[in-house]
Amino acid sequence: MNHTAEKLLTFIKESPTAFQAVEMMKTRFTENGFTELKEDEHWEIKNGGKYFVIRNHSAIIAFTVPEVSSDVFHIIASHSDSPSLKIKENPEMVENGYVKLNVELYGGALLAPWFDRPLSVAGRLIVKEDEQICEKLVIVDKDMLMIPNLAIHMNREANSGYKYNVQKDMLPLYGLESAKGSFFKTVAEAAGVKEEDILGHDLFLYNRMPGTVWGSEEEFVSAPRLDDLQCAFSSMEGLIAGKNEKSICVHMVMDNEEVGSGTRQGAASTFLRDTLLRINLGLGRSYEDYLISLAKSFMISADNAHAIHPNYPEKADPVNRPHINAGIAVKYNANQKYCTDGISAALFKELCKEAGVSCQVYVNRSDVAGGSTLGNISNTQVALNTVDIGLPQLAMHSPYETAGVKDTCDFVKLAGVFYA
């Protein structure tokens, strides 16, 4: 198996929710000499230093400061969250001899693939420990849940456009009636805490099926949450491998992109603005110096793109239709759902040439409305010259997505050059 793809799959396996993804990045950065900063403490920023700061345990910004002073930020933005089903408060529902869990939809999930596959629960618990309120990350590492389909004999419309009702059709089966009252006991045991100490929770279902590399030449990688952990992983690896000599290099991974980014840990928050300003102040510069730095800086907003589908080619633009493993996709939208313009696209294409990787173009069909992503949302807080890009993938927002091995390697390589 390709080494980079193997590392990506390990990263994804250990990151069933945004909380674990950020914890994995924290571990990788700490292992590579980065120092953690706290938002509620004073920062000491030095030339040659490597740092990271976390907000809500689900968003992270890591950065390096070159030995020789620089006032330019090179930023790659991605996101830590993926569509899922979130556990509601008081989740156990006992009906007809079964225990189900009450869930609600998080983000724009593709629902059908969630059926008839082993699932479990991960996220965080808020607990009282030694008279202190603290977070405990938790992964229930066993096949614990399943959302069973209704047999075709009882739903003749199943293959002809049946519309799923999340409140009725998507409730996962936890056990027989004898399992009543045991859900939080199971979660508490997995977290190493007492059930009675749980004060709150942010728990999500996750697909237990492991990722894999496949295809006639092992050219495809399939796994849960490729959107957008594939980009987050590539940016992280690029920052660790980069020389970091020419600019202040910033790896930014925000939460809640799939639900609009309008949280304190989302792209619409002040997290990036606060961090860049504090870096600038920590280096002894004025607020005007900070504004000058922003005018010189560049951001790559990295969120996966739709590859042309083998069975639905008509869903793609007739000309601009990205292929898997044919290059990083530069994303355009006339209505500014993406930040890419002629200038930022030209700069990115030159960066691709420097890195020795290919790029291609993604544009929606003119009769299909596209969604926005990190770039234009974060620009409402920090005005930066920005290009929107993505790695082409299939089955976006499915609990099991497919992308390209080569594209992952190319983005790691490009990120390393960008972070030179």
What are these regions, as identified by a protein language model?
Residues 1-420:
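N-terminal hydrophobic/helix-forming segments and targeting peptides
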